[in-house]
Amino acid sequence: MKIFNTLSATLLGLAIAAPAAADEFNANHFFAERHSMVRGPYVDFAKRVADRTNGEVTFRVFSAGSLLPPASSLQGVRDGVAQVSYHAGTYTPAELPIANLIGNMAFYNTDPMVMAFASTEFGLTYPAALAEWADNGVVFGGGYSTSQYFMMCNTPVETLTDVEGKRMRMAGGAWSRFAEFVGAVPVSIPSSEMYTGLDTGSLDCAVATADALDSFSLKDVVTSMNTLAIGNYYAGFEWGYNVGFWQGLTAEQRRVLFDEMAYELAQHRVAFDADVATAVASATDAGMTVLEPDAALQQALADFVVADEAALIENATSRGVENPDQVLTDFKAIIDRWEALLKDVDRTDTEALADLARSEIYDRLDADTYGVN
């Protein structure tokens, strides 16, 4: 019986780690399929890759956490449950201290296009980041960025005084520290629970991207949205690959993935911002009021950005990051570079943006060696 159980467990482990079929690989995302970070970067991406590889690389997309829950996506791609996955870095601060260090610098530049491209370049090229991915058994494929986070509330929040004491759903990390800095009460709950919190009154505000007005139906339970840009989220990766899967591809197949990730990096940003515009328009039509932050609230955010850098460095040091101040300096330089590169580019032109991602990032990678050596 002991031999049978051991053999059964071994076979089960092999079955879980193997692709769904000989020519089909698992792609995991915990957002719903209708979300812009899944529609393009996973559903459309899978179709485009299959077409360009003549079906030799075919992904089966699992969305809405149907394959892996959010906190398990890093481990799941490492262990081969998924061959590619999205991962939100704040779920694994101990495993990904560098990814969280730069991810918590979300207030330095709140332009989501800039941050999507900058986080991608950093993750693909920065030596300390590459070492961190390797230590976790993941090949980094590309980054992302949400649109700006706003306060969506069931009570008017316009001034610094209005913010004080408000219970705000925050994404953790720097966002929670900002809430405390301005006298609010940070509440850590999944985005799937924002609606209930606002509806029952356990939350006063949800701080999230404004497409949540539609995607999480928040427009039914909020009365106002403050346009103070409270950072944007880009910690972790949009595509992280299982090492064995990646190294089993040909260089030509890896080049296809590079090309298509460049395209979807651009496409998801264009689509995300379009979804935000649609959601805000729909919510205002339904009666939501859009409020501008007062000068005191804007100044409080500016003061926080300066003050919080010390906390970022302290947290990173406690997690074993060497020279975190230099990492931040280097990342700021990458951000500033992308701010300049994107200055005159049409933010709605997916092809132009994708070409820029290729020429400045992906075409500079060696498909023979990246993630292999």
Question: What is each PLM-predicted segment?
Answer:
Residues 109-135:
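Short, solvent-exposed loop/beta-turn-alpha elements that line the ligand-binding surface or hinge
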Residues 1-8:
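Bacterial N-terminal signal peptides that target proteins for export
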Residues 16-22:
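Sec/Tat signal peptide C-region and signal peptidase I cleavage site
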Residues 9-10, 20:
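Cleavable N-terminal signal peptides
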Residues 23-113, 140-373:
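N-terminal secretory/targeting leader peptides
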Residues 1, 22-23:
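Absolute protein N-terminus
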